[in-house]
């Protein structure tokens, strides 16, 4: 049964909200860097990863890949009117500092930088050391 060609549903475009203060969550692991920009309540405004930015394999875990990922997340966040950022960094990866520098050079006012890396009180056994 084919739909009637003449009828169209009235679809209203979702209005973009304006968020001035936001939080940038940078998860820098040894293999990848994930940058997520959220509003104050934690609702995601934009995100980008080093792997999703076109880097594959060992190039994903470089500071340059983290810089590109932070720039891409920042571009989308600018559309929401974001001006001020609080940065939360998690993980020991190589993209920690370069992601912050990229967000700063993208034109955001960075209010605070917080390291929220989870530190175990002798929890899980770590992976065995590499023998190359």
UniProtKB/Swiss-Prot annotation:
Keywords: Ribonucleoprotein, Ribosomal protein, RNA-binding, rRNA-binding. InterPro entries: Ribosomal_uS11 (IPR001971), Ribosomal_uS11_bac-type (IPR019981), Ribosomal_uS11_CS (IPR018102), Ribosomal_uS11_sf (IPR036967). Transmembrane segments: none annotated. It comes from the Bacteria. GO terms for cellular component: ribonucleoprotein complex; ribosome. Signal peptide: none annotated. One of its GO terms (molecular function) is rRNA binding. One of its GO terms (biological process) is translation. Located on the platform of the 30S subunit, it bridges several disparate RNA helices of the 16S rRNA. Forms part of the Shine-Dalgarno cleft in the 70S ribosome. PANTHER family: 40S RIBOSOMAL PROTEIN S14/30S RIBOSOMAL PROTEIN S11. Belongs to the universal ribosomal protein uS11 family. Part of the 30S ribosomal subunit. Interacts with proteins S7 and S18. Binds to IF-3. This is Small ribosomal subunit protein uS11. It comes from Dichelobacter nodosus (strain VCS1703A).
